[in-house]
Amino acid sequence: MKQDEDGPSFSYELLSVSSKVADRLEAALEPLGLSLAKFGALSKLVAAREPIPLSTLAERCACVRSNITQLVDRLEADGLVSRADDPHDRRSIRAELTDEGRRRQAAGLRAIEKVERELLARVPKASQETLLGLLRSLHLSS
């Protein structure tokens, strides 16, 4: 991260904002017993609308299989996800949301939306769409 005489560079500012936003989101999710990682996995399962193989969940969460296994272990221990055999592939295990998992994901979504509203309140209305578009343009393809 390069800094010039006038202050932090673009990448430093972006990382700083990203870290602060992540901290606020984690703090909003913590009372629900969720982390950003848990919320992300639950959200991918909600979007799937059906049980999905752990390998697919790992892809959608952009993490390796061993990490998703540990994450699903924690979600299962919390009663938010259950594992089910894949009827089409006996070697594969699918992750499935429980009713509590759906409720907790919905509550997490509300908590995140509240943080987003608070953050966007700092940006003039006329600039909000532009900001979102600029942020989306920075996504790097893998």
What residue spans do the PLM features occupy?
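C-terminal regulatory/oligomerization modules of transcriptional regulators
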Residues: 1-6, 125-142
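N-terminal leader segment of winged-helix/HTH proteins
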Residues: 1-32, 78, 137
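Active-site phosphate/pyrophosphate-handling residues
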Residues: 9, 40, 118
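Pre-recognition alpha-helix immediately N-terminal to the DNA-recognition helix
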Residues: 13, 24, 40-44, 103, ...
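N-terminal helix-turn-helix DNA-binding core of bacterial DNA-binding proteins
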Residues: 19, 23-64
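Charged, amphipathic alpha-helical coiled-coil/dimerization segments
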Residues: 22, 53, 73-133
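Residues in the helix-turn-helix
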Residues: 67
